Amino acid sequence: MSRRKKAPIRQVLSDPIFNSKTITKLINTIMLDGKKSIAERILYQAFEIIKTKTNKDPMEVFQLALDNITPQLEVKTRRVGGTNYQVPMEVTKRRKETLSLRWLIHYSRLRSEKTMQECLANEIIDASNKTGSSIKKREDTHKMAEANKAFAHFRW
């Protein structure tokens, strides 16, 4: 364990257009090399694509997608008596949001559409319909936790 103080959790400002801290966190996750204006443009254009494709409020579609991606359990490695065990643990609220945003962006970048806006929009739409790679990642994480349920007593 480090003897240094824990870094304080910085408060994120709400997004000016959607008035949501989650959107700001998503923009920060999309951002590469500190280019925030480009990340904002990608997200806002992706939301426009979602609006035209689904004829629904893009914020509602995004929130539904995020709820579908969010993991409830994950496995953490614990060393007990010289053996490493994959111990299933509940995910904290903050980590749930972080993981779901990270997975959404990661699997958007792996898609083969022409622009990042299209990739992100289609991944959000797929996630809201409970399909897509980010949903598969969540299911795989839950399967790992279920398979290692026998080691749940190592949780401390």
UniProtKB/Swiss-Prot annotation:
Pfam families: Ribosomal_S7. Disulfide bonds: none annotated. CDD domains: uS7_Bacteria (cd14869). Keywords: Ribonucleoprotein, Ribosomal protein, RNA-binding, rRNA-binding, tRNA-binding. InterPro entries: Ribosomal_uS7, Ribosomal_uS7_bac/org-type, Ribosomal_uS7_CS, Ribosomal_uS7_dom, Ribosomal_uS7_dom_sf. The keyword Ribosomal protein applies. One of its GO terms (cellular component) is small ribosomal subunit. One of its GO terms (biological process) is translation. One of its GO terms (molecular function) is tRNA binding. The keyword Ribonucleoprotein applies. One of the primary rRNA binding proteins, it binds directly to 16S rRNA where it nucleates assembly of the head domain of the 30S subunit. Is located at the subunit interface close to the decoding center, probably blocks exit of the E-site tRNA. Belongs to the universal ribosomal protein uS7 family. Part of the 30S ribosomal subunit. Contacts proteins S9 and S11. This is Small ribosomal subunit protein uS7. It comes from Mycoplasma mobile (strain ATCC 43663 / 163K / NCTC 11711) (Mesomycoplasma mobile). The lineage of its organism: Bacteria, Bacillati, Mycoplasmatota, Mycoplasmoidales, Metamycoplasmataceae. The gene is rpsG.
